[in-house]
């Protein structure tokens, strides 16, 4: 089955998480007016007394065509990815309780200046780069037992 890739924006992505970006966001000045702070762009959640981790993930490009056959979710914490070198990347998400609801399966492509923060329990494809090796600043929960993986019928991404 084909899955159309849509441009990433907060309105269409809001059921799945937060788009981390400065475009059309409020800010205030700090540090004697030298810095614009775009404050509270995503809600970070960590359950069960674990701690929040900040890491860098170096992702390799996916083989083309991009084929989706499994999704994962993290029930005990949110997970954020922000590209550090301005590269666009693709995110694939779905809602659902015990298993992904394929009627909500969506794919989005960022503009290279956007990151994403997946809500807890949102099904998503494991991280990959799109066209070139990409470093991602990653914010997520430390600890174990926080990744459910489900196989799904194969979908091929369709870039229009």
From Swiss-Prot:
Keyword Lyase annotated: yes
A GO molecular function held by the record: ureidoglycolate hydrolase activity
Pathways per UniProt: Nitrogen metabolism; (S)-allantoin degradation
Reaction(s) the record says it catalyses: (S)-ureidoglycolate = urea + glyoxylate
InterPro entries per UniProt: RmlC_Cupin_sf, UAH_cupin, Ureidogly_lyase, Ureidogly_lyase_bac, Ureidoglycolate_lyase_dom_sf
Keywords: Lyase, Purine metabolism
Enzyme Commission code: 4.3.2.3
CDD domains noted in UniProt: cupin_UAH (cd20298)
Extent of the signal sequence: none
Biological processes per GO annotation: allantoin catabolic process; purine nucleobase catabolic process
Keyword Ribonucleoprotein: no
The organism's place on the tree of life at top rank: Bacteria
Cofactor dependency: Ni(2+)
Pfam family, one: Ureidogly_lyase
Family: Belongs to the ureidoglycolate lyase family.
Function noted in UniProt: Catalyzes the catabolism of the allantoin degradation intermediate (S)-ureidoglycolate, generating urea and glyoxylate. Involved in the utilization of allantoin as nitrogen source.
Quaternary assembly: Homodimer.
PANTHER family given in the database record: UREIDOGLYCOLATE HYDROLASE, UREIDOGLYCOLATE LYASE
Protein name: Ureidoglycolate lyase
């Amino acid at each position: 089955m084909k899955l159309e890739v849509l441009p990433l924006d907060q309105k269409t992505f809001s059921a799945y998480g937060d788009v981390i970006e400065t475009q059309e966001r409020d800010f205030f000045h700090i540090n004697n007016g030298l810095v614009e702070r775009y404050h509270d762009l995503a809600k970070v959640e960590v359950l069960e007394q674990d701690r929040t981790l900040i890491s860098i993930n170096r992702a390799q490009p996916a083989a083309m065509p991009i084929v989706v056959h499994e999704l994962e979710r993290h029930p005990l914490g949110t997970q954020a990815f922000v590209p550090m070198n301005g590269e666009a990347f693709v995110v694939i998400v779905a809602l659902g309780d015990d298993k992904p609801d394929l009627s909500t399966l969506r794919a989005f492509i960022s503009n290279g200046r956007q990151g994403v923060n997946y809500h807890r329990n949102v099904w998503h494809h494991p991280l990959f780069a799109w066209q070139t090796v990409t470093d991602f600043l990653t914010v997520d929960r430390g600890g174990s037992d926080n990744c459910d993986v489900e196989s799904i019928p194969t979908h091929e991404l369709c870039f229009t």
